[in-house]
Structure formats: C-alpha cells, structure tokens
C-alpha cells in the first residue's frame, strides 16, 4: 500500500535534506563495540493495518495482540460461538485458540522509526564488526512489506511527497516514514564515520542490487544496476554473470547519498522487470513485484600494532520478497518458509534448489556469522488461513534460537558472545558437536532413551544432593568441568594405542553385563566415588580410573568393596558408612590422599621413574656384576624404588600389602626359587674368563651375575683398596634408559649395549650401597686406559687372524695397533712421476713395504666415495693415466715380436688377458689416485687360449721392468695413500705425457727417435721374466693394449673407433683415442698430467671399455659392442691382424665388465655399460 513515489525512489534527496536520526539503542551498541561472532536470528511480527470494528457481526475478530507479552492469539472464526453460548457448550471438535510469541510485535500505531530501529539494532553493529547482516521482509503480497523496507504513509494512502508539501510526484519521502533500506544506508555510513575517527580504519562501500521474478520461476536473476556499470569508476565486477553467485555488479558508493541514488535506480529497474511502471487505472489488481535483494558491501582494513594489516569484507543485505509468495506461478509461502528453515538450520541442500531465489537466499543467510532480522507481515483483513500460515512459519523460525547451528564456528570469541547473549536474541549459542562439518568423523551417540538428552550428545548427570559427600563436588559434575574431562594422568597412562584398546575392550565387556533397567544409577554414584574414595590396590584403582575416564557406567563389584572402604556399593549410601560420623576429618584426609594419587603420574606396569634418576644412574649402572643402585622392576615394589634391592633390602613378607604391583606372594616365591637355581649354576661354573668373545655368551653371564646379586646378603665385603680398581670397562659406552631395561624379562636375554670387551670374573657383593663409594678422576682414568688397551688388543687379534701367512714377516715391525695415516697432501703426483725415472740400482723402494698391507683396516678419506665392487679387488683402483710412457715400449716390443719372437715372452701366463678381471671405479677429479694399485691375489682359473696371438703378449711385470717402473708397481696403496718420506729426485722424467684431449703432431717423430733402445729393452725383459716365477707373474692382471703403428689415434676412423655423443659417460678421451678399459674417469683432465707442459707430451692409445676400440691381437672381438676391427702393428699388417681379431675368442673382459661380481667362468659376451 505504499505510494508510488516511495516505490519509484527519491531517497537520495531525502537523505540529503533530512537524514533519519540514529536511535539511542543503536548508538550505544556502536560505541560499546560488542563482539558479534555467532550469528543470531531475530523474528518480529508486524500487523500493518488497524483492527476492524468489534461491533461488526459479519467479520468476527480472529487475531488478538498482546504487545506487553509480545504474543499473538489466533482463533478460528468458524469456531467462534455466539455470546449467549457458554464455553462448556462447545463441541468436542472445536479447536482451541493458538498463541504465538515473537521477539517483537508491532502494530499500525507504532512509528516507522521504531520498527527500523528494532530491526537494525543488531544488524548494523555486526556488519561494522566484520560479520554479515540481513533484514528480510516476508509475507503474502500486499501485506505491508514495501512499507517496512522502503517506507510511506500507509494510513492515508497518499504519497509521502504530498505530505511534505512539495506537490511534485518526484519529491523525497518524509524522514519520519523512511523505510528500513534508507535508514540502514544512513545509519551504516554514520557508524562508519564514527569508527573511522576512533580507530583510524579505512572503509570502502560498494552497492549491488538483484531482482528475482515473482511469477517466472524459470527466469534468471536480474542485475538491477547493470545500467550504471559503465558509468561507475573502479568497479571490481563490471561483467554480468548468469547467476548471482558469480558476482553481481558492485558500484562504488563513497557517500550515503550515492548509495541512496543506486537504491532509487534499483527500484526503477525492479518496476521495469515487473512489467508495469504505474498503478493500473481500472480497478484491477496490481502486478506482483519481483523480489529485491539490495546489498551494501563493506570493505575495511586497519593497521595492527605489530605492523600487520587486519580487515575483510562484510555485507548488509536488505531483502524484500515482494510478491514471490503467491499462488499464481511463484513459490507458496510455505515453500519459502521451508527454504529459510533449511538454510538457517545449516542444511546443505535446501528444497526448491531450482528456483532462482534459493541460491540467493543461501548466499545471504548461510554464513554462521550472519545476523538475521526477519519481519513477518500479516493483516487483519486477510484470511485466517493465510495469517495462520505466515505466523506459523515465523514461529518455527523463531524457535530455531533453541537449536544449534550445524556449521563450524570460525571464531572462539563468538561462542562466548553467543553463550552470554541477551534474552531478546533467538539464535543458537554455539557450534553443534554432532555436526559432521566440524570434524571429518561423524560421532553417533547410542545412549539411553531418556529425557535427559535430545539424542545429540551424552547426558550430563548431576550427583545426588541427598549424599552429604557429594554436595561439595556437585559443581564439578557440570558440563565442561573437571569430572567431564578425562584427568591428566589417564592421558599419560592411556596414551599408547595398545593400552587404549585394552581399556576399551575391558569396558566393553563390562558394559554388556549391565542390567538394562538401571543405566544411570551406578554412574552417578561412581562419579561421586571417583574423587572421594580411598586409594585401593593399584590394579583395582587403575581399573576404576579407566572406567571414570571413559565415562562408562560400570558398577564396582561387591567383592572389591570392604566394610572399611569408602567406595560405595550400588545399594549403599555415604551417610551409612562407618567412618562418616565417627571421624569427620578422616574423610577429608582420604580425599586429599586420593587427589594426590590422581595428580601423580600413574604407571600401568610399574612405579614411576624420573629423568633425574636416569641421568644419575648412567655412570653407575654398568658395574662389574651389573648391580644397580636404583634398579627398576617391571612388577617390583614401588616403595623401594629409590633404594638398592641388594644386600638385604628385599621387602619382608609383611610388607607385601604395601603395594607390590601385580606380583603376589606366590609369584615372588617362584622368582626367588628361580634366582637361587640360576645362582647355583653360576657358582658351579669356573670363575675364569671364557675364551669365547661372542656377545651372547657374555651377556648371558652378565644376566646371571645380575640375578645373583638378589640372593647373597651374607657375603663379606671387599677390601677398600679394590673398590676403585674394578670399575667396568663398559661404563663409558652408551646406556639405555631405565624404561628399556624394564622391558627386558628377568632371564638371560641379550643386552644391546654390551661391547666386545672382556668381562672380568664374578666378584662378591659388598653391603654398602654403590652410591657411597668415592670415584676419583684417577680411577676413572685408569679404567678408561685399561678399556682402550683391551679394545686395541682385541682389534689387533682380529686383524692378525685375517692376515695371510706371507705377511707375518712384517708384523714385528709394526706396533700392536695399526693406524693408517693419509699422506696424500704431502706427496704430490709430480714427485711420484719424478721418482719413477730414478736409477735402477736402487734395490728397494721406500714404499715397497706398503704393498703388503692387507691388514689396513681404514680407507683413505680422499677416496671414501670409491667403494669396492668385488672381493678380489675391493681396494684396487685401475687408472691408466700413468702408463702413457709405455706406448713406445709396447709398439717396439710387438714389432720385434713379429720378427724375432723371444722365448721369454712365451713363458708368460698362458691365460688370456681377457680372462683377467679388470675393475672400474668412478674416481673424482680431486682424487690423488692417479695410478693403479695392484693387489697380489690368487690367479683366477685359467682359460684355454683361443688364439695363437694371446701367448705373444708380454705380462705386466715384464712391461714394468722394461719401462724401468718395477718399483712404481708397488708405489700406490689400495687406499690411495702415499709415503711422506718419498725423496725428491732431481732427475726429470724425460719422456713426458701428452695432454689427453689434444692432438700431438710430434708423436710420430718421438716414436721413431727412440727405436734405437729396443734391443736393450728386450734384453732387460728377458732377464726379468727369467727371474720372476710364473705364479708371481700371473697374479698381476694383463692389460689389453691397442698397438698401432701411429703414435696417435685420432678416433676419426669410423671402422675402428665409433664416435660417442657429447654427453656420454665415456668423456672426450674416448673419442680422441684414449680408451681406458673399465676405469675411465668421467672428468676431462688427468690429475697426473695437470702439471705438465702441453708441448712436450706424447700420446698413447690404450684400448678399453669406454672408447669402443679394440684390443690388440686376439682382443678385438671379445669386447661386446666393439667394432670387430683392429689396428695392426704396422699399416701394412692391418689385414693380417684382422682375421686374428675376429677369431681371437669372445670371452673374458666384456663379460666381466657386465657382471663384475659373479664372473667366475667368462664364457659369454656382454655389453659394456657406464656406471
């Protein structure tokens, strides 16, 4: 019934000229800054018209209002009896009047400002505090909803513009008749201005408006401010989406007048979407207005004290459902009520989800922090059924204040605010613990079917007030108090999953035995008895504490309750106990003792042990006979935990009732008999040290000595001079905690912290406790030195047992404990190269003794990354960078072998060079190991010669002797260490190495220039091979070498040397002709050639596994992926060696490289793979 002026707008001018004054209640709330955490629902009823004349008999009154009680009474007019009839004469089917109460009740006599102040008093402060707020007007069409939301003079039916005297149809609405929407705009901006002045926070307000058709449920929501989107500046959402949840247009509104202007524009767009812009002239019904959702988005932020930024967004929704609740295509009012009930109660899937109004309402009302004010509208003139349905829906929403929200609560302060809310609010007070949205697990309470609970949580029972002892602890039984929460000691005791399972299983078995008719009585009495009962036997007391902690109503068995006990029986009363009246102070003392018991830490299987005692016993626990001062028993006496259990400290028979854990007298007797039996067995054995050093035997004896100490109280004490000398050698090793010792059974199981050192014979005990002995620093030092010496002797014996018989002649030159010293920093590789060229008259190299060091137990720290890959060469490192000098020796020797074969060469090992194992390691650039270390190992099984050319290859010993490097073979150790006493030779190494990665044009000339010394080299080779035995020669692996007539193999011959990729693991030296067999390093430079000049170095071509080249002679086809071609000794002899290479056997090297750990019979061919 509002005027067309108020529906068309004009609120911008009204707020400019006469803004509505802020109500005093709202001003107080804004100044107090209350915390609005949890949202509330406030439901009000407004009767928009005046009551009809009571004298009219045709239209009897069915609605009675009581503003004082805020109550409305509805009476069915069909059941209204005439005045002459009495109430007792009504028929039995006549219904009684229905009464409904609300948070507030308004009639036509109430001012518009009072209605707006009551509706917005909690919504606006909540928005300024960061929560959402919503004002919703609901009812059937033409019941006064536009009047409440927008304003107007309903009584006169004339426009507010005429009342102001302006006479224009577009004049502003009078200030006294402004609705909730313009008042909310004015009061919100006024509150923002005050908040900005007080706190310094910054605010930004944006406006959006959405309309929903009342008669077209399939139509989409309409953005009513889309026409202003292009004109607005800095609009964050300028694109219109299909639905409201995607985001409507938000227009910036820096002032209240600007926001009111947007409200006027939204109202104009609402009328257009409804299909009519004016009231119909003919007396037909007015068109149904579409629903309006006008939203003020408040963005605020402020700087905190610590320099951070705090803020966020809150929204104020003003919703006018208009004519949506109609019976001509729209939702009925009952459907809207069901949607509101589902959203406000926290349901995820409200009904009528296909209607465009449903997602809009859910977006506005669903947040838990949203404060909702609902104004239901009825009229006296409407039918009884319509008024009843409207009031019933509003009453159902109003009763939701006693229901709890089913959505998680974001702020903890909101719960406190919700619990302390006033009586006028009707929202839930906290989060519902039964909601599945709070946690991932859904908890279903299967409790008793009684009136104490609504099925959502276990009942909270109060102790009986008739019991005198229970009155003092009644407050503790309230919800959230100490008795409802589990005690702290039960958290410590039941922290492990195994203990929780056992306790729950025991509780479940006892719950099954409960009678079904008394589910509450024993719980009440036991909750009272848990705090005031006397301490029981520890086993029974722990069971009782577990029952109380789990909340299971388990009665105490009668056989566990004595007459003198304070534990109440199921039929007993605290007032009937013997000690209740005789000793009034005894109950208090017992209560205090019980509370002390509760506060202390309780162990399930033994007494408590503090960390201080553990730290104190670390250096005294490992005595010779393993006697511990504070020995902890798994089931031992708690009262003797701080004393020694040796030498007559065992508890007497009368002290068993003092608390002996789970062990009764029978079990104690059995253990004592077992100790005696074990002690007698120990004494029958000789008292000498066992020759075996196995840990099992040692620890078994230690366990016997440990048990022997429990049954020898009559032994004499030791002389005092022996006390400080017999500390064990094990006391400086790591000790386990007492908790680990407690887990061991009292038999001879192994102790994990015992070392390999010897154990002295058993010593008698002395009566005085170990803590009284004086332990000086000298005695500790002597004990430590004895322990170290014993460990060294033990290690030396183990090393000596592993050494071979050929190395025993060097044992007398070394001390008893062998320690390796890394000398790689003192001896450079350049010095090693100079030493290689020294004179031959030196009979013994200073480092030759280091080649017989199989018993070195430590590896150099410079090559710790190089691990052993097989047993036969676990410390060997093959590196052919130092053998570059042998190139010309090989070429000359093989050239002479073609012309005048020597008998000495044929006396070498007949086994193929490819049957010898060659090892490959990844040696880094920082390694000092630049040459191989050859270990004298037994020769592998000899393989039959597969070609005549295999026997013509010289052995490595002969090659080394020819090159003058007989001492160099013994230079390097398996761990890469060198002798620091290596003398510096001034004689330079004449034939220098060449850079591996360069091409040297002078190699040919250097090779031809040195051909004149071949006869001398041949003579020396014959002498060495005659002197050395065949077995010694066969121990060193033979090297497959590529003998080429050229001094440099460029690798460009595609038939012999395939090119590798740029990123291949073989590296560039494989491409340039330098092929290391299986030990090529991934680095591009040699550590030996790093200090040499590039102009004087010569190349060498050594066939290997990395480069893809072929071996000499018979080694060509033995390499799996190699090309089956080889370079001959001369260019004219290439064809001659090619058929030898093809027929030279296919076994040995490649198969070993493929499987270096299990190559016993190298019969097959394999591929070479990079590590």
Curated annotation (Swiss-Prot):
SMART domains: KISc (SM00129)
Subcellular location: Cytoplasm, Cytoskeleton
InterPro entries found in the cross-reference section: Kinesin-like_fam, Kinesin_motor_dom, Kinesin_motor_dom_sf, P-loop_NTPase
Family (UniProt): Belongs to the TRAFAC class myosin-kinesin ATPase superfamily. Kinesin family. KIF26 subfamily.
Record GO terms (molecular function): ATP binding; microtubule binding; microtubule motor activity
Sequence ranges of Polar residues compositional bias: 1043-1059
GO biological process: one example: microtubule-based movement
Biased composition (Basic residues): 805-816, 1124-1139
Protein name stated in the entry: Kinesin-like protein GA13060
Domain Kinesin motor: 40-400
Primary subcellular site in the record, as a coarse category: cytoplasm
Chain residue ranges for the region called Disordered: 1-24, 737-774, 798-820, 932-955, 1043-1099, 1124-1143
PANTHER family recorded: KINESIN-LIKE PROTEIN CG14535
Keywords linked to the UniProt accession: ATP-binding, Cytoplasm, Cytoskeleton, Microtubule, Motor protein, Nucleotide-binding
Signal peptide: none
GO cellular component: cytoplasm; microtubule
């Amino acid at each position: 019934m509002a005027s067309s002026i108020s529906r068309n707008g004009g609120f911008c001018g009204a707020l400019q000229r006469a803004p509505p004054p802020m109500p005093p209640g709202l001003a107080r709330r804004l100044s107090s800054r209350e915390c609005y955490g949890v949202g509330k629902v406030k439901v009000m009823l407004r009767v928009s018209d005046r009551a009809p004349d009571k004298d009219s008999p045709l239209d009897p009154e069915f609605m009675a209002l009581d503003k004082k009680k805020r109550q409305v009474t509805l009476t069915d007019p069909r059941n209204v009896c005439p005045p002459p009839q009495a109430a007792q004469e009504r028929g039995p089917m006549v219904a009684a009047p229905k009464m409904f109460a609300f948070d507030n009740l308004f009639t036509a006599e109430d001012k518009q400002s009072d209605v707006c102040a009551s509706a917005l008093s909690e919504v606006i402060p909540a928005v300024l505090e960061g929560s959402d707020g919503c004002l919703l007007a609901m009812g059937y069409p033409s019941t006064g909803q536009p009047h409440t939301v927008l304003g107007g003079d309903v009584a006169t039916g004339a426009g507010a513009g005429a009342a102001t005297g302006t006479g224009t149809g577009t004049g502003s609405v009078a200030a006294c008749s402004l609705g909730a929407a313009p008042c909310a705009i004015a009061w919100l901006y006024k509150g923002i201005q005050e908040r900005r002045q007080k706190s310094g926070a910054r605010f930004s307000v944006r406006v959006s408006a959405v309309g929903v058709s009342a008669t077209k449920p399939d139509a989409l929501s309409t953005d009513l401010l889309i026409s202003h989107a292009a004109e607005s500046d800095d609009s964050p959402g300028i694109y219109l989406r299909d639905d409201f949840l995607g985001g409507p247009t938000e227009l910036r509104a820096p002032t209240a007048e600007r926001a009111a202007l947007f409200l006027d524009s939204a109202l104009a767009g609402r009328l257009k979407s409804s299909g009519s812009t004016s009231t119909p002239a003919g007396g037909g019904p007015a068109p149904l207005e579409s629903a309006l959702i006008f939203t003020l988005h408040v963005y605020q932020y402020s700087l905190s004290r610590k320099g951070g930024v705090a803020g966020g967004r809150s929204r104020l929704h003003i919703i006018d459902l208009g004519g949506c609740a109609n019976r001509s295509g729209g939702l009925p009012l009952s459907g809207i009520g069901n949607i509101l009930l589902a959203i406000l109660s926290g349901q995820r899937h409200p009904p009528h989800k296909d209607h465009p109004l449903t997602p809009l309402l859910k977006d506005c009302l669903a947040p838990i922090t949203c404060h909702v004010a609902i104004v239901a509208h009825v009229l006296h003139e409407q039918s009884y059924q319509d008024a009843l349905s409207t009031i019933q829906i509003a009453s159902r929403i109003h009763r939701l204040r006693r229901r709890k929200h089913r959505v998680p609560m974001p702020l903890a302060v909101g719960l406190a605010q919700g619990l302390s809310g006033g009586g006028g609010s009707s929202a839930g007070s906290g989060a519902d613990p039964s909601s599945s949205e709070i946690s991932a697990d859904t908890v279903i309470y299967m409790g008793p079917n009684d009136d104490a609970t609504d099925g959502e949580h276990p009942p909270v029972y109060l102790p009986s007030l008739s019991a005198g002892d229970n009155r003092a602890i009644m407050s503790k039984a309230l919800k959230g108090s100490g008795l409802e929460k589990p005690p702290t000691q039960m958290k410590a005791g039941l922290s492990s999953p195994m203990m929780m399972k056992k306790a729950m299983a025991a509780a479940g078995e006892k719950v099954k035995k409960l009678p079904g008719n008394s589910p509450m009585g024993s719980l009440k009495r036991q909750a009272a008895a848990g705090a005031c009962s006397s301490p029981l036997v520890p086993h029974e007391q722990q069971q009782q504490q577990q029952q109380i902690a789990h909340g299971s109503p388990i009665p105490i068995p009668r056989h566990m309750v004595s007459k003198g006990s304070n534990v109440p029986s199921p039929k007993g009363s605290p007032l009937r106990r013997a000690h209740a009246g005789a000793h009034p102070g005894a109950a208090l003392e017992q209560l205090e003792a019980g509370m002390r018991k509760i506060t202390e830490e309780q162990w399930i299987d033994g007494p408590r042990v503090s960390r201080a005692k553990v730290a104190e016993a670390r250096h005294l626990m490992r005595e010779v006979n393993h006697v511990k001062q504070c020995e902890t028993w798994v089931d031992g006496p708690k009262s003797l935990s701080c004393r020694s259990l040796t030498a007559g400290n065992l508890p007497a028979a009368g002290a068993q009732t003092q608390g002996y854990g789970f062990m009764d007298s029978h079990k104690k007797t059995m253990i004592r008999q077992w100790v005696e039996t074990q002690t007698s067995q120990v004494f029958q054995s000789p008292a000498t040290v066992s020759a075996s050093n196995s840990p099992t035997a040692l620890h078994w004896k230690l366990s016997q000595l440990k048990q022997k100490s429990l049954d020898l109280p009559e032994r004499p004490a030791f002389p005092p001079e022996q006390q400080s000398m017999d500390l064990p050698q094990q006391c400086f090793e790591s000790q386990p905690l007492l908790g680990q010792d407690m887990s061991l059974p009292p038999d001879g199981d192994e102790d994990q912290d015992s070392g390999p050192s010897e154990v002295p014979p058993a010593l008698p005990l002395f009566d005085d406790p170990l803590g009284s002995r004086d332990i000086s620093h000298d005695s500790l030092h002597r004990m430590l030195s004895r322990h170290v010496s014993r460990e060294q002797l033990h290690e030396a014996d183990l090393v000596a047992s592993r050494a071979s018989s050929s190395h025993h002649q060097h044992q007398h030159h070394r001390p008893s404990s062998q320690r390796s010293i890394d000398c790689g920093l003192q001896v450079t590789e350049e010095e090693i190269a100079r030493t290689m060229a020294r004179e031959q008259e030196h009979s013994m190299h200073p480092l030759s003794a280091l080649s017989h060091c199989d018993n070195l137990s430590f590896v150099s720290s410079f090559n710790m990354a190089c691990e052993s890959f097989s047993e036969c060469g676990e410390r060997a490192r093959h590196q052919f960078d130092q053998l570059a000098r042998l190139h010309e020796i090989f070429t000359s020797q093989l050239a002479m072998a073609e012309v005048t074969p020597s008998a000495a060469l044929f006396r070498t090992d007949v086994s193929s060079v490819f049957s010898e194992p060659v090892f490959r390691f990844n040696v880094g650039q920082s390694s000092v190991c630049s040459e191989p270390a050859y270990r004298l190992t037994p020769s592998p099984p000899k393989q039959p010669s597969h070609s005549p050319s295999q026997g013509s290859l010289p052995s490595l010993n002969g090659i080394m002797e020819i090159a003058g490097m007989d001492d160099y073979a013994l230079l390097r150790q398996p761990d890469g260490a060198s002798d620091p006493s290596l003398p510096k030779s001034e004689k330079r190494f004449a034939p220098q190495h060449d850079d591996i990665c360069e091409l040297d044009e002078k190699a040919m000339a250097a090779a031809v220039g040195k051909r004149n010394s071949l006869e001398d080299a041949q003579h020396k080779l014959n002498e060495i091979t005659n002197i050395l035995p065949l077995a010694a020669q066969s121990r060193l692996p033979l090297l497959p070498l590529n003998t080429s007539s050229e001094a440099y193999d460029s690798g460009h011959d595609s038939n012999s040397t395939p090119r590798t990729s740029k990123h291949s693991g073989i590296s560039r030296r494989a491409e340039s002709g330098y092929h290391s067999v299986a030990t090529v390093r991934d680095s591009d430079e040699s550590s030996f050639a790093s200090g040499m000049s590039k102009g004087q170095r010569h190349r060498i071509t050594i066939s290997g596994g990395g480069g893809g080249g072929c071996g000499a002679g018979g080694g060509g086809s033995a390499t799996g992926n190699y090309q089956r071609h080889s370079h001959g000794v001369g260019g004219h002899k290439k064809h001659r060696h090619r058929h030898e290479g093809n027929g030279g056997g296919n076994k040995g090297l490649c198969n070993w490289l493929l499987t270096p750990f299990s190559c016993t019979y190298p019969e097959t061919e394999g591929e070479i793979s990079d590590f």
